[in-house]
């Protein structure tokens, strides 16, 4: 797969800088490492903030969902890698309007661990927060083990619905309730038509024929449950 890149090891930072340079009316970089993308305008006082985050390589998730009535900020990790605890904490600080912050993201081990620790950090700064996990991928675990399912396409619906609830100035408990109701109602399955090429690796992650597709594959090329 051909790509236009300067340096495959720097492309995430260059991508984020380019995004904010191209659309300063929508986005700004934040955080010590510049790995937080936040809304360009300051969050309204008394509004619940909504944050998400995860690895790069899933556009338009996550940066494409930062905006009015959507996410207030997101933390961006390397390709297929979770953002750090500090980056997630920075995203939460950017989204804090004094009414608490909802952490709304996919059910992936590294993201869960780091967002939980970021929430604990913000709690020490007197910032209240809550969590809703998206686990809509029916191919990744059985119905009896739904808590193990990954979050994929359902994130887009949850961002929009929870974002609208926050924009209407509902409190944190109500925004969390609406987000959880949305998450519980989302079910999806992935279909991979072609393999992806991680820039640092320079070769496809798997092989698939032109007349085939892989059903149930995750966003980071995880296989479906057997």
Which positions does each model-derived feature cover?
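N-terminal amphipathic/basic leader segments beginning at the initiator methionine
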Residues: 1-49, 210
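Gly-rich Lys/Arg/Thr-decorated short loops/hinges at beta-loop-alpha junctions or inter-strand turns
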Residues: 45-53, 62-75, 139-142, 213-226
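Glycine-rich oxoanion-binding loops at beta->alpha junctions
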Residues: 58, 67-98
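Short, acidic/small-residue loops that bind anionic groups at enzyme active sites
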Residues: 74-79, 123-148
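A structural-propensity feature for long, helix-poor, extended segments
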Residues: 85-107, 113, 141, 146-160
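Internal, active-site/partner-interface "lid" segment
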Residues: 140-149, 159-220
């Amino acid at each position: 797969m051909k790509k236009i890149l300067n340096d495959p090891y720097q492309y995430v930072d260059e991508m984020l800088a380019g995004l904010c340079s191209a659309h300063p009316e929508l986005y700004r970089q934040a955080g010590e490492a510049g790995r937080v993308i936040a809304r360009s305008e300051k969050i309204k006082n008394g509004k619940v903030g909504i944050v998400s985050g995860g690895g790069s390589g899933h556009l338009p998730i996550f940066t494409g969902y930062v905006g009015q009535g959507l996410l207030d900020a997101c933390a961006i990790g390397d390709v297929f890698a979770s953002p750090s605890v500090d980056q997630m904490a920075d995203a939460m600080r950017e989204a804090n309007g004094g009414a608490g912050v909802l952490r709304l993201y996919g059910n992936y081990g590294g993201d869960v661990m780091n967002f939980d620790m970021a929430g604990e950090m913000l709690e020490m700064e007197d910032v209240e927060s809550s969590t809703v996990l998206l686990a809509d991928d029916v191919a990744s675990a059985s119905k009896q083990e739904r808590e193990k399912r990954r979050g994929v396409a359902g994130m887009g619906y949850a961002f929009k619905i929870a974002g609208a609830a926050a924009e209407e100035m509902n409190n944190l408990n109500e925004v969390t309730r609406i987000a959880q109701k949305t998450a519980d109602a989302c079910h999806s399955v992935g279909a991979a038509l072609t393999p992806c090429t991680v820039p640092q690796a320079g070769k496809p992650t798997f092989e698939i024929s032109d007349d085939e597709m892989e059903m149930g594959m995750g966003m980071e090329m995880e296989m479906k449950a057997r």
